[in-house]
Design a protein with these regions (language model features):
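Glycine-rich phosphate-binding loop plus the immediately following alpha-helix
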Residues: 1-4, 12, 20-77
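Fold-independent oxyanion-binding glycine-rich loops
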Residues: 7-10, 27-29, 92, 118
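Glycine-rich phosphate-binding loops at beta-strand->alpha-helix junctions
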Residues: 107-127
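Adenine-nucleotide phosphate-binding core of ATP-dependent small-molecule kinases
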Residues: 55-109
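Glycine-rich phosphate-binding/hydrolytic loop that grips phosphoryl groups
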Residues: 125-126, 135-172
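A glycine- and small-aliphatic-rich helix-loop capping segment at beta-alpha/alpha-beta transitions
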Residues: 19-25, 29, 126-132, 155-157
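Conserved active-site and cofactor/substrate-binding residues in soluble primary-metabolism enzymes
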Residues: 40-44, 80-83, 87-94, 122, ...
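Short glycine-aspartate micro-motif
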Residues: 4-8, 15, 114
Length: 172
């Protein structure tokens, strides 16, 4: 596919949009949606960082759906776990919907939609319901496979990957 959106929703949420085979935009966890463990800084966290009570990285690693409540996946009840995955699905859908608006400006009216990350298969149905479109979960090793394919392209002399130039120092 030349037009697609991938949202990696797990410990944090990162979404990338590709139009005509080129990266059109990306949303990273520190500025938008929290994942299960990490997330954007709220006003209280920003104040604590400004007061030098914690670093921005510490605030980010405590800003997730579960960590804000002092929970872990292993240490929460089934009800808490379901609520966390529901929230994760909502945040992933929100980022995908936002990226879809950007891709429309790049003539990608109906990009394919994918979810990555360990919870992908668990939340894909809910994200599909929220968006009114099919969102396909990727297998857990697909990100590693994608990295290997990019490395192979660079090794073979690719000058760009998805529209981003390859540093001349690493080209063959």
């Amino acid at each position: 596919k030349k037009d697609f959106i991938i949202s990696d929703a797990s410990s944090n949420v990162v979404t990338i949009g590709v139009a005509a085979g080129r990266i059109a935009g990306a949303i990273d966890a520190p500025i938008f949606a929290p994942g299960l463990l990490h997330g954007p800084l709220d006003v209280a966290a920003i104040r604590r960082v400004d007061a030098r009570e914690m670093t921005a990285n510490e605030a980010f690693t405590r800003g997730g759906i579960l960590r804000k409540r002092g929970l872990t996946l292993k240490g929460c009840t089934e009800e808490e776990k379901e609520a966390a995955f529901e929230a994760l699905a909502l945040y992933a859908a929100m980022e995908i919907a936002a990226m879809a608006v950007l891709l429309r400006d790049h003539a990608a009216a109906k990009p394919a939609l994918y979810l990555a990350g360990d919870p992908a298969s668990r939340i894909a149905g809910r994200v599909s319901d929220l968006l009114g479109r099919e969102v396909l979960p990727l297998a857990s090793c697909d990100a590693a496979l994608g990295c290997a394919l990019i490395a192979e392209d660079v090794y073979k002399g690719a000058r760009e990957v998805l529209g981003i130039g390859v540093d001349g120092r690493v080209r063959g």
